[in-house]
Amino acid sequence: MCIRDRPESRIQFEHPWPRPMVTTDGHNSAFYLTNARELLDVPGEWYHDIDTRKLYYYPREGENMQSAEAIVPAIETLVQIEGTLDRPVTNLRFERITFSYTTWMRPSVKGHVPLQAGMYLTDGYRIDPKMKRNYRNHPLDNQGWLGRPAAAVRVAAAGAIDFEHCHFEHLGSTGVDYEEAVHGGIIRGCLFRDIVGNGLLVGSFSPAAHETHLPYDPADRREVCTHQRIDNCYFTETGNEDWGCLAIAAGYVSDIHI
């Protein structure tokens, strides 16, 4: 964003549209500014001064900073499994493993304009006059393109990638992402807890180069995620900071059993 007036009572965002917050006539929805030293007013909060490379922390009552444990995540993805449509990665099983403590730095660097399920707008334009659409949809007054949040475990172009009795905890974005072209795979008896974004993502939703209002209809049906089984898992405290996220989000998929 850029400051418009001084003193800094008014702020103009760099991209005039889409607006960083959903609005109706005369009413602005809430938006949030973070990581300012002036906002450090509640025990348990912290502030990172990027310029001086110092971290400031407001201790909780009774907390001894001489013995306190601090974990600072430095990586966004712990495990990445990716093949191709013609040569998918197959038959991997993870059992009784804890995946924890990841970060996701994009919102801190570029901001975060979420749409749904943690997907964020990378670009958008207003259309005037509005575009007429079929299927009884209302006329379209904008176009937008989406990005996909990072994940602690990312799987793409693969088959039979299983997770059994694993823990996914304290994560800076998505827990597990079966992104695209994943066939089969069991997630059974797993715990998803204390996660900033989605617990589990399955399916492509809207590829980066695909305008988000257009129906997703890939020419190669192998791109569609199919036959995943999510069984006897426990999801709690997901969407902790990105409130538009979900425990389980599955989009443009086939034959999934939850």
Predicted segments with their positions:
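Short glycine/acidic-rich loop motifs that flank beta-strands on beta-rich extracellular proteins
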Residues: 103-109, 150, 172-178, 196-202, ...
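Short, solvent-exposed turn/loop segments enriched in Gly/Ser/Thr/Pro and often Arg
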Residues: 179-180, 203-206, 246-254
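Right-handed parallel beta-helix
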Residues: 90-101, 139, 159-173, 182-197, ...
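Structured core elements
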Residues: 12, 56-57, 177, 199, ...
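Extracellular polysaccharide-degrading/modifying enzymes targeting complex plant/algal/animal polysaccharides
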Residues: 4-157, 162, 209-213, 217-219
